[in-house]
Design a protein with these regions (language model features):
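Oligomerization/assembly interface segments of phage tail-like spikes and tubes
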Residues: 47, 51-81, 132-148
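Short beta-strand and beta-hairpin "edge-sheet" elements
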Residues: 101-151
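Residue-level recognition of well-ordered beta-strand positions that form the cores
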Residues: 67-71, 103, 141-143, 208-212, ...
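Polar/acidic, low-complexity leader/linker segments enriched in S/T/G and N/D
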Residues: 1-45
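Short, charged, solvent-exposed linker or helix-capping segments at domain edges/interfaces
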Residues: 150-158
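Short, acidic/charged, Gly/Pro-enriched secondary-structure junctions
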Residues: 73, 77-123
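Intrinsically disordered, low-complexity segments enriched in serine, threonine, and glycine
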Residues: 157-338
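Solvent-exposed loop and beta-edge segments used for protein-protein assembly and interaction
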Residues: 60-64, 94-96, 132-136, 199-203, ...
Length: 338
């Protein structure tokens, strides 16, 4: 039987093992459980007294409990090619509190990876001294807290071409700037099938945006900002953006977009639109999320969505600043489902 699947492991120490070719004398054994196919799922249902059978309510994708073995060769009694040395290098690649990267590459689906950690200590048969055997099976009991296989994120950029910076002191109301009067530039990012599709996976995804803060420091105010001293917002240069939060399943919100808070110097932000996460993370650590007035991103991109053009508005930016859109690629399996 011929297989062109390549399985690799990148350890917590950066060491890479090719478990298919055995480049370090470590080969993947048979009978892998809980790893390559769908993760376990728990269905939630109800059984009303006046209803025949049951009704589906929801389902939850669970962690993966993974068991597999590796065959570690002994090609020399001592040195780097001995079982003792190879087994030691294999163990040093693993940790309980940090994940390894299990990588699977196939001609059909490319490369996908799963984050795995130790769940129990590795086991080796000690009926005989393993240092005297030509080959030993090491059994690995692992856990994958995130059950999805990932491709590398797809990242798309929009670059500002117009200088839309302004002085906040030009406006009548200090600290309160009317969006309609700010100089603005409209940017677009188009994602379609020619670049792999918007979401070709079988899972919902939450886009991540990165937006830049102002390139200008607050006049007559020290940087880094001194703790306990109020920032003079009324004279602080800032950038501001309108970021898409399009719904692909509700026409009422098909063109929903949200305006970010003003971002001053040092507040380059990552916007994670996942409702379960902190949505604004500032480079300076400032709590930008506290200035959103409770308005949150809420829409995800459904599986197998082919294309969309995202329209972004930017104000307060210098020419040449970048706005990025990052799309994760989670899959239920390490191959297929395209």
């Amino acid at each position: 039987m011929f297989s062109d699947t390549v399985v690799e492991l990148e350890g917590v120490n950066g060491e890479v093992f090719n478990l298919t070719t055995g480049d370090q004398g470590v080969y993947l054994a048979t009978d892998v459980e809980g790893c390559f196919y769908d993760p376990p799922v728990k269905v939630v249902f109800e059984e009303p007294g006046n209803y025949p059978g049951a009704r589906y309510l929801n389902h939850r994708i669970l962690k993966r409990d993974i068991t597999f073995g590796v065959q570690i060769l002994q090609d020399a009694k001592h040195g780097e090619r001995s079982w003792l040395s190879r087994d030691s290098e294999w163990r040093k690649a693993w940790a309980f509190n940090r994940p390894c990267k299990l990588i699977v590459t196939t001609p059909d689906s490319g490369t996908r990876y799963l984050w795995v950690s130790l769940f129990e200590s590795p086991k080796v048969d000690m009926k005989y001294d393993p240092r005297g055997n030509p080959i030993n099976l090491t059994v690995m009991s692992c856990i994958s807290y995130d059950p999805f296989w990932y491709e590398d994120d797809r990242v798309f950029y929009a670059k500002t071409k117009t200088d839309t910076r302004f002085k906040p002191t030009l406006f009548d109301i200090p600290g309160n700037w009317p969006w309609e009067e700010l100089p603005k530039e409209t940017l677009t990012i188009t994602v379609d099938r020619s670049v792999g599709g918007l979401n070709p996976t079988d899972q919902y995804i939450s886009p991540k945006w990165s937006v830049p803060g102002s390139t200008e420091k607050v006049p007559e105010f020290p940087w880094p900002f001194p703790p306990g001293v109020a920032i003079p917002w009324e004279r602080a240069p800032f950038t501001q953006f309108v970021i898409p939060d399009y719904s692909f399943e509700d026409d009422e919100y098909a063109n929903r977009r949200l305006k970010t808070p003003g971002l001053i110097y040092g507040e380059n932000c990552i916007i994670n639109t996942d409702r379960r996460e902190e949505q604004f993370s500032s480079e300076s650590g400032s709590p930008v999320w506290a200035r959103t007035n409770g308005v949150r991103f809420r829409n995800m991109i459904p599986p197998y969505t082919e294309e969309r053009t995202f329209v972004i508005e930017a104000s307060g930016t210098a020419a040449g600043q970048l706005i990025s859109l990052r799309l994760p690629r989670p899959w239920t399996r390490c191959w297929g489902l395209e």
